[in-house]
């Protein structure tokens, strides 16, 4: 341990503490990574090396793991570099009881955060204030933070899938779309909800809202083991299209993806 660094940054975990927490026998400091890896590669017959090269941030051209995979391939051209992201993704889809419990807690925190947001929502409030009401609640109640940058889009801003500036005023008779979630012990909630800024839907807003709600319920009813996300998405799109046709917003089902 570096006493100077610990004075500035706080106490660091020792190797023995890391072993006990991770339950992994061989643990070392990150600054020995290159020498350990080089020793293995020069003394052992290594044919395949796996990297998780999933791009976690939509704006990142290359994240840390992708950079490390590229550097490795250049340094050891005789070894095949393979992507283990699909394997890890499949493993992550299967949750044990402890994981489900943590996800439920993340959802509970998110639910309470939304209730706090709704209690303060009113015309004249800024989108970032609605965001702050949510994020204050989840942090105060034990969340690690947010699952992803909170989306709080009022009016036309709610039509943008990844609107994150959250800087406009929430006006009377408009809707506020929220895409948000709390993270708890590494597990994330992800919920989208839409509320009338003044607390009451207009007639047209209610009609559209009820079509979306019907699609949500239809997907929940149809969902079962073995179904693909594409199949569930098709269920959703059909209910949305039928509802929009009834309201006169579109004429044919295939138009649902145009707006």
Name every feature range the model reports, one short phrase each.
Residues 1-259:
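Active-site neighborhoods and metal-handling regions in enzymes and metal-associated proteins
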